């Protein structure tokens, strides 16, 4: 599942809360055998836009660390909406490796049929 235009900066706090709640009810739900973070990492992706993070690069990088995954975010532009970010689509301060994951690797892994059309 891909969540578009939902933002992603709320995710670390939400996952922390889910994990805490899950630990408290594990005895009552033995069929839920994986932690919420694992379930989200294997099944859900989020679009980059809108970036609702503070403009400081350190804060954004810390958010990615708290999510414990660089595979959750997919490139998006929010075009053609009026609040489209234009040339400032990518937040400042992301490492080249993370930019490649967001713009190429994560979309190719999420939309596996894309890789077939690229090869053709």
Predicted features along the sequence, with ranges:
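Aromatic-lined glycan-binding groove of carbohydrate-active enzymes
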Residues: 1-43
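Mid-to-C-terminal alpha-helical segments outside catalytic/metal-binding sites
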Residues: 10, 27-35, 45, 49-50, ...
């Amino acid at each position: 599942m891909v969540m578009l235009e939902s933002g992603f900066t709320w995710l670390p706090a939400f996952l922390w809360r889910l994990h805490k709640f899950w630990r408290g009810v594990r005895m009552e739900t033995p069929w839920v055998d994986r932690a919420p973070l694992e379930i989200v990492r294997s099944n859900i992706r989020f679009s980059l836009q809108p970036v609702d993070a503070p403009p400081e690069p350190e804060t954004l990088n810390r958010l990615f660390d708290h999510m414990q995954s660089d595979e959750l975010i997919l490139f998006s532009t929010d075009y053609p909406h009026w609040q489209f970010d234009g040339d400032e689509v990518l937040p400042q301060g992301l490492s080249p490796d993370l930019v490649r994951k967001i713009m190429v690797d994560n979309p190719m892994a999420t939309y596996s049929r894309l890789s077939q059309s690229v090869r053709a």
